[in-house]
A protein has these predicted regions:
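Sec-dependent N-terminal signal peptides
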Residues: 1-4
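Disulfide-bonded cysteine-rich modules in secreted/extracellular proteins
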Residues: 29-42, 134-138
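Extracellular attachment/recognition segments
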Residues: 39-118, 155
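Collagen/collagen-like triple-helix recognition
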Residues: 13-34
Length: 155
């Protein structure tokens, strides 16, 4: 009954002028994806000679895989782009868009030296569509802070 009275008390009249435009919002990043994942020390598998270790991570099914794939490893409080060399140990990665599998490899730069099992590590993957990357040609993709700022990444 109260609703009926509220609608009945409204009068049809002329439409007023449009209000002012709102402020311009921040540049979005809807098409740039970023996620963090861990590889535990128990997930690393050595090759038969013990010269190289590998581990895999499968991206979530909802991940859009078109574009550039950039991988960073947490190094103290910073993110270092792969490939990355630390104390003679090289970290590099391969990405297969068909399976959405990121494979991380760790090996001694001298290629003939056995290395110990890598520790647990935290990685960040950033996927940037080609059109978005072309709009930002001066971004140093090897510098995560620059990537984060340019593409408005929250993490």
């Amino acid at each position: 009954m109260i609703i009926t009275i509220a609608f009945a008390s409204c009068k049809k009249g002329d439409t007023g002028p449009a209000g002012p435009n709102g402020a311009t919002g921040a540049t979005g990043n809807a098409n740039v994806q970023s996620l963090t994942f861990n590889i535990d020390s128990t997930q690393w598998v050595a090759d038969s000679a013990g010269l190289q270790w590998g581990a895999t991570y499968t991206l979530p099914a909802a991940t859009n895989v078109s574009g550039g794939v950039f991988l960073y490893v947490q190094d103290d409080n910073n993110w270092a782009a792969l490939p990355h060399v630390d104390y003679g140990i090289t970290l590099e990665f391969n990405y297969d868009p068909a399976t959405k599998i990121v494979e991380v490899q760790s090996a001694d730069a001298r290629a003939s030296v056995m290395i110990p099992n890598p520790p647990s590590m935290t990685f960040k993957v950033v996927i940037i569509p080609p059109a978005i990357a072309r709009q930002n040609p001066n971004v140093n993709m090897g510098n995560y802070r620059e990537v984060k700022a340019a593409f408005n990444l929250s993490n």
